[in-house]
């Protein structure tokens, strides 16, 4: 699949030259001058960016993020999610990998926070899965779509802080079988290491999971995912997002 993905991305670049989400110059989906917006926290120590240690949702060992949900970062995430600009998954996923590698905490597998299957069919892809696949590739970790949404939920941005946890409580479950790809034409130039040569009945048991999402606000969605993973036998769960919205 990797050669086909490279050809597909090359064809896309030739037919529709990328325009930078930050400065609108043609050439790259996020140019070299605008990419530093993704790394504003790169030199900071790992910790508890949502607030005090007690504010981390209990199922998560750690929660981190790359940049504030403002300016260039906000535009890039919006264009990936709503404008079909899949090429942005490459710089966004690479930023996630850089941040996680810098704080040096570790993980065994990378798992994306899934959108509901109906929404993925309408959009044509899952933006968090595209980001997570690139991050897994750069971290040289297995990429596993281990979670699914068992029910549709209201978009978190439409809810207040107090309603977000209730909205996603019990919404996620671990898939019966693991997979090494998103099921679509992702942006990565090569495959991430596979978890096993054949599907596993429980891809998370005994493993430290790194959850990847596009945006985190209260951490409720990541916490709900972590709960499902821990109940399925995951050893520990950490979370990271491209951006944090306050």
Predicted regions and their residues:
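Glycine-rich phosphate/pyrophosphate-handling loop used in enzymes and phosphotransfer proteins
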Residues: 1-246
């Amino acid at each position: 699949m990797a050669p086909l993905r490279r050809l597909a991305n090359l064809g896309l670049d030739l037919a529709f030259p990328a325009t930078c989400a930050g400065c609108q110059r043609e050439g790259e989906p996020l140019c070299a001058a605008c990419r530093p917006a993704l790394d504003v926290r790169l030199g900071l120590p790992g910790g508890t960016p949502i607030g005090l240690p007690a504010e981390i949702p209990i199922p998560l060992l750690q929660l981190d993020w790359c940049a504030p949900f403002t300016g260039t970062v906000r535009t890039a995430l919006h264009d990936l999610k709503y404008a079909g600009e899949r090429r942005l998954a490459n710089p966004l996923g690479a930023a996630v990998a850089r941040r996680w590698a810098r704080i040096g905490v570790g993980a065994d597998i990378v798992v994306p926070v899934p959108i509901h299957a109906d929404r993925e069919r309408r959009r044509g892809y899952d933006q968090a899965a595209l980001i997570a696949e690139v991050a897994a590739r750069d971290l040289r970790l297995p990429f596993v779509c281990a979670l699914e949404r068992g029910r549709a939920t209201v978009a978190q941005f439409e809810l207040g802080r107090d309603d977000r946890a209730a909205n996603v409580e019990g919404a996620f479950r671990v898939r019966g079988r693991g997979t090494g790809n998103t099921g679509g034409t992702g942006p990565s130039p090569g495959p991430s290491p596979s978890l096993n040569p054949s599907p596993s009945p429980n891809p998370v048991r005994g493993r430290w999971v790194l959850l990847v999402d596009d945006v985190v606000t209260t951490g409720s969605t990541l916490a709900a995912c972590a709960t499902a993973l821990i109940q399925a036998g995951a050893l520990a769960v950490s979370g990271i997002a491209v951006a944090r919205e306050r």
